[in-house]
From Swiss-Prot:
Its EC number is 2.7.4.25. It comes from the Bacteria. This is Cytidylate kinase. Keywords: ATP-binding, Cytoplasm, Kinase, Nucleotide-binding, Transferase. Pfam families: Cytidylate_kin. It comes from Bacillus pumilus (strain SAFR-032). Belongs to the cytidylate kinase family. Type 1 subfamily. GO terms for biological process: nucleobase-containing small molecule interconversion; pyrimidine nucleotide metabolic process. Transmembrane segments: none annotated. One of its GO terms (cellular component) is cytosol.
Amino acid sequence: MKKKLSIAIDGPAAAGKSTVAKIVAAKKSYIYIDTGAMYRAITLAALQHGVDLEDEQALDALLKKTVIELVSTGEGQKVHLDNTDVTEEIRTDRVSNQVSVVAKHRAVREEMVRRQQELGKKGGVVMDGRDIGTHVLPDAEVKIFLLASVEERAKRRFEENQKKGYDVNYDQLIEEIARRDKLDSEREVSPLKKADDAIEIDTTSLSIQEVAGKILDAADRVEKQ
């Protein structure tokens, strides 16, 4: 029987991590864990409760009493915040523009990493985020780091938002993604960083299926070792 692997997929905002991770998880019959959705959920909770996003203690206290669940359904994974489906709401610009602010706090990241490690400890998981290969699953057998230009990522997010009927501005998206890159890369705790043993994939000129194929090939190579 093949050993169930842990697959860590990291990369900057809008690099296609979640889309690719879902495909890889489905092909491998693994559990998909969207860590970004967890940070988005606590960001939404903070906005709903009027918590100052720079107040680390207040955010930590809120997180400790907040239930965030990733629920598998026939329509894909849903995100529940205290038993309420917030799958769509966490993808709005209101949340997207603030999630990096919330995610920079040490106390928030420590609690999230603890929850994520608990979810991933049995293997057979595909987890995507900013610090999966470096902090959450440092022993993952397959580590991937996705790259794409800011312009390409803004284009993808623009098209994604248009399909959902959101009013979006391409130039504004470029600015927001560049700002998130800066926040994610420069934060003190678990910054966005490629793990030393991660395979780097530039997705700029690749389709989602091609990227997923490269990751599945990497997993196959590990399984054959």
